[in-house]
Design a protein with these regions (language model features):
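Short glycine-rich anion-binding loops that position phosphate/pyrophosphate groups of nucleotides
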Residues: 147
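Nucleotide/phosphate-binding catalytic cleft detector across ATP-hydrolyzing
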Residues: 1-35, 39-144, 158-274
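A structural feature that tracks compact, well-ordered secondary-structure segments
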Residues: 150-152
Length: 274
């Protein structure tokens, strides 16, 4: 886990500073179409972070693309940004979907990535992508996104169960908007303001507890000793403690939880010739 934290910190800095690591050989690209953010991750063949880019987005809702053109334009813009930074053309990519969505929605997500100029060579479910970065062989991964919470259970390195529930960061935003009587946009900014976290978290805590109760229901019947939480909506200091108390199972969250899944998608992509 220590190595994972270092890799995620490095990847986060690359995005924050808009810079790239030196590399040799071929590159792998992952595209994560999230409800709140679109992230592109680029790694070398050995899965070391090389570059990344992210954009706030509202083009996906509960794992369904609701603005195809907007999604395609955002991915195309991020792709061009990274190509300029790297000095190469990124031709192939993997992408990911929430567990259990219908084939038509899977195809739509792939079409967005292809419409932005990539050849899609792999589609993986989001919690499984995260599990590869966390190097988990046994346990459960819970990916708390903007619109959905995805669950994958692993045994001996194999995924034995996946599920997805339409609850996530958007529901936290709605609770804040209702509590304070403010517009959704203002509530979203408030939710992300780290200086206000001590005021915000007690209000959205019941949403986190509800998420845990949903996960607990899915985990019943399976032997799970540890739950690993990722995803942008889990980025509160007290999230994992609250989740663990409601779930009754040891809960672990790494740093830069928003970036775990995008990096895992890239790890599960084939390599472009650089």
């Amino acid at each position: 886990m220590l190595m994972t934290k270092e890799v995620l910190s490095e990847f986060a800095e690359l995005i924050r500073e808009n810079k790239c690591n030196p590399y040799s050989g071929n590159l792998k690209t992952g595209v994560d179409l999230g409800t709140a953010n679109i992230v592109i991750a680029v790694t070398d063949e050995d899965n070391h972070p090389v570059a990344g880019a992210t954009a706030v987005s509202k083009v996906v809702k509960d794992g369904i693309v609701v603005d195809f053109v907007g999604a395609m334009q955002t991915v195309r813009r991020l792709k061009a940004q990274l190509e300029e930074l790297l000095g190469v053309t990124l031709e192939t990519a993997a992408t990911a979907v929430p567990p259990g969505i219908i084939d038509g929605n899977v195809r739509c997500i792939s079409n967005v990535v292809e419409g932005a100029g990539f050849e899609v060579i792999n589609v993986i479910d989001e919690p499984t992508a995260a599990a590869s970065v966390l190097e988990i062989t046994d346990g459960a991964v819970v990916d708390v996104g903007g619109g959905t919470t995805g669950i994958s259970i692993l045994k001996d390195g194999k995924v034995i169960f996946t599920a997805d529930e339409p609850t996530g960061g958007t529901h936290m935003t709605l609770v804040l908007a209702g509590y304070y009587g403010i517009p959704i946009e203002e509530a979203e900014k408030l939710k992300k303001d780290k200086d206000k976290e001590n005021d915000v978290f007690p209000i959205i805590k019941p949403v986190v507890e509800k998420m845990a109760s949903i996960v607990k229901r899915f985990l019943s019947g399976y032997e799970v000793d540890c739950v690993y939480v990722v995803g942008g909506a889990s980025c509160f200091n007290e999230f994992e403690q609250t989740f663990e108390k409601a779930l009754g199972i040891t809960t672990v969250k790494t740093n830069d939880a928003l970036l775990v899944t995008p990096l895992g998608i890239a790890w599960n992509a084939g390599a472009d010739c650089a």
